[in-house]
Amino acid sequence: MQPLPTLCGRVLVALILACGVAGVQGEERRFPPARATPPLLGFEEIMTPPTKTSWPTGSNASVPRLSAPPQMPKAGRTAGAQRRTLPPPPCERTIEIKETFKYINTVVSCLVFVLGIIGNSTLLRIIYKNKCMRNGPNILIASLALGDLLHIIIDIPINVYKLLAEDWPFGVEMCKLVPFIQKASVGITVLSLCALSIDRYRAVASWSRIKGIGVPKWTAVEIVLIWVVSVVLAVPEAVGFDMITADYKGSYLRICLLHPTQKTAFMQFYKNAKDWWLFSFYFCLPLAITAFFYTLETCEMLRKKSGMQIALNDHLKQRREVAKTVFCLVLVFALCWLPLHLSRILKHTLYDQNDPHRCELLSFLLVLEYIGINMASLNSCINPIALYLVSKRFKNCFKWCLCCWCQSFEEKQSLEDKQSCLKFKANDHGYDNFRSSNKYSSS
């Protein structure tokens, strides 16, 4: 009678396994559309698909299945193949983005959109209309504002739509164009900040170089290189993004995302290393260059301060003001882009789709991603505000330009447009310093 317990144990184990298989198959029949996320999907693909108010219980990600409705495993498959097709354990609670967050996100995005267009357009008009503002640093700031304006006009409306809507109605051309413009505008911002930091060090290191009116040839070359390099680095985005048809709750949706399977080895490598590449080049690089050249600039100031002539002290104050402005722009950039890069790095380091507690982390990362997108968009509209607060010259010119836009068209005269900035700056102590330094250099 000794084999009886062993036989009963085997029967009990068989019943448990049968119940488990039946439960898994029942779950698959009940929630076929949003059952599992393909393991190749990156974190920004979590962003691109529709984000409903709540996802069905048992879903392990915020994206629908990128395939046809699931089929039952065939009897001829091996045990290893069946284990690979089984989905991860279901979530204990739903993954959701509440309607309140959607409304707040929409309001914030609209506010950033309006402020960004007004601020960057005003900044470009100030530099274009007034010859006294056309110098090397200001032309780089104008390039920065133009890149921000492209980001605001193209990306912010699309990001708001992706959060509120389900389908992608814009076609494959816009699917490739939007991420291309986004990466190009970010590249323009990053490289412009790097060029500004290097330019400030060169201005302090060469005390004999007096700032004048006009665009230096080297600055023009820098701007051309910045735009060309930014466009070239954004080409993989246009190549990798594509339209995918996804099965979601019984209906097929068109989704724009970085395709899970790329055609070339380079694009597959780019897809796997994309988030680390964005973090290192588009975030760490400008911070490292700014820290390096501002350290050299500080050492140069301390070394030459005692030996400078008194007449150059006022000119030094002007360069310090410009350096402070550039430093504020870099600091604002770091604070605005940190949440977005942090969410993507956390996704790569902490998220495990086989973890039973992954759903809470995924909900947190999804919300953090949208907060990061809003903060990154905020960087595009906050640069003119930072210039208004830090620089007296930009503040006076902003006041003049906004007042001119509030007046009627008949009251505008070309002579006032050309001389108003100079009138404001004539009352500014910084302009007197600049004029005295020019007199000293001419003598």
From Swiss-Prot:
UniProt entry keywords in alphabetical sequence: Cell membrane, Disease variant, Disulfide bond, G-protein coupled receptor, Glycoprotein, Lipoprotein, Membrane, Palmitate, Phosphoprotein, Receptor, Signal, Transducer, Transmembrane, Transmembrane helix
Subcellular location: Cell membrane
Disulphide bridges: 175-256
Residues bearing a lipid moiety (S-palmitoyl cysteine): 403-404, 406
Extracellular side: 27-102, 165-176, 245-272, 352-363
Residues carrying Phosphoserine: 306, 420, 441-443
Glycosylated sites: 60
Record GO terms (molecular function): endothelin receptor activity
GO cellular component labels: plasma membrane
Region named Disordered: 51-89
Keyword Disulfide bond recorded: yes
Stretches with biased composition (Polar residues): 51-62
Record SMART domains: 7TM_GPCR_Srsx
Modified residues (Phosphotyrosine): 440
Keyword Signal part of the UniProt annotation: yes
Gene Ontology biological-process entries: calcium-mediated signaling; developmental pigmentation; endothelin receptor signaling pathway; enteric nervous system development; regulation of blood pressure; vasoconstriction
Disease linkage: Defects in EDNRB are a cause of overo lethal white syndrome (OLWS) also known as lethal white foal syndrome (LWFS). It is an inherited syndrome of foals born to American paint horse parents of the overo coat-pattern lineage. Affected foals are totally or almost totally white and die within days from complications due to intestinal aganglionosis.
Name of the molecule in the record: Endothelin receptor type B
UniProt organism field: Equus caballus (Horse)
Phylogenetic lineage: Eukaryota, Metazoa, Chordata, Craniata, Vertebrata
Recorded name of the encoding gene: EDNRB
